Amino acid sequence: MTPILDAERLAVLVHEVRSPVAALSAIAEALEGDTDVDTRREFVRLVTLACRGVERVIADVAVASIRFEPIDPEQLVRDVVAGAVVRGAQVELTVVGELPAIDADPFRLRQALDNLIANALVHGPAESPVSIRAEAASAVLISVTDCGPGIATVELDRIFDVGVQLDPTSRGSGFGLPLARAIVDGHDGSLTVTSSLDEGTTFTIALPLRQA
């Protein structure tokens, strides 16, 4: 069982995140002025380092605050879908067979799934529903698929980086996918993505089965 995030640890994490955020703010201000190519290249390097610092804090927070308990993954997915529908989203759910109980933090897992659905809604056309599929094999698999423009193969590794927005018009924060992956990693699971240009994108959460 992973320990709950307490006030002391939270204070440390807040302190840790201030440095990279301050660096990003300073770089943004500097970029408003006239800078040459070499200076801008150095700024890009510093932004990358600062974002990696934020990523480490996000992962630390996600893992440190996880509380495991036996849950029904099908009910959790249905609850998340119901919440999305209430908010006006078009979501289609398919559950294949019976899903076994797993050990997970229901709050954090809902957060991860909510982030994936929100991402799919942003990038998919308004008239096309987001498709969610849940099934069990060697793990419990939960997939979220949109009918958006897709992601180029060369960009797939970047989408889990903090602050990355492949669509410059997106209103997202750039934190949803990194946080979702950190939460799933904290469950000893995996979050993977497959995509085809002009065909859409699928994110798949794989969660380990309970030990017998």
Stretches with model-predicted labels:
Residues 119-121:
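Short helix-loop "hinge" at the ATP-lid/N-box region of the Bergerat-fold HATPase_c
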Residues 127-138:
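Short beta-strand/loop element within the Bergerat-fold HATPase_c
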Residues 63-69, 97, 101-104:
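Conserved micro-motifs of the catalytic ATP-binding
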Residues 151-163:
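Short conserved segment of the HATPase_c
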Residues 41-70, 75-87:
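Conserved DHp (HisKA) dimerization/phosphotransfer helix of two-component histidine kinases, i.e.
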